[in-house]
Amino acid sequence: MTYFQTLFYEQHTNVIEYNGITYHRFWPIQVDGDIILSLKFVEQRSKYTQAIVLMLPHNFDGSVSISENHIPIPKTSFPALNFWEDSAPREFDVSIKNFTGEIKICNGADPIGTKQFCKHLSEGCAMIVREIGQGKYSFQCNDHEFDGNCDNLVFELEIRKKTKDKGMVCVNPNEKHR
């Protein structure tokens, strides 16, 4: 099997069809104001520690919190927050406030066991994304190895937006939400 990274690069895209299955390198989420990402680890079947990775743009000027606790954003060219399956809560909410733009979610893996390095968007990393409800998605992920079975990490995401008249509502990740 060819690395997913090679297939994504050869086709100049972040979404590919391979053996009749659609694979995503990452999943874009349009943000306009404040949203809540409800994340849930469902299953892990890898010899490597797995992570849900939230990638922020280099010009991110909003704020991120988990359970009302502010999360400092790394001061790097490509800031990312790694939520490791063995240390993050099984279910948690990530609040993103005061930001308009695109964030990305993908999977990652720790190839050396230190959590100081997270392989994502490279080698075998890819995801099968399925809609399982209004604003709710299942991600079946492959780690950085060649196998391509996308069973190394399974997680779910629900995207909610606070509205003036309806309270919290589930929303589509690829539309601007006002």
Model regions and ranges:
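Extracellular distal adhesion/interaction modules in secreted or cell-surface proteins
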Residues: 1-131
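Acidic, proline/glycine-rich low-complexity IDRs
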Residues: 118-178
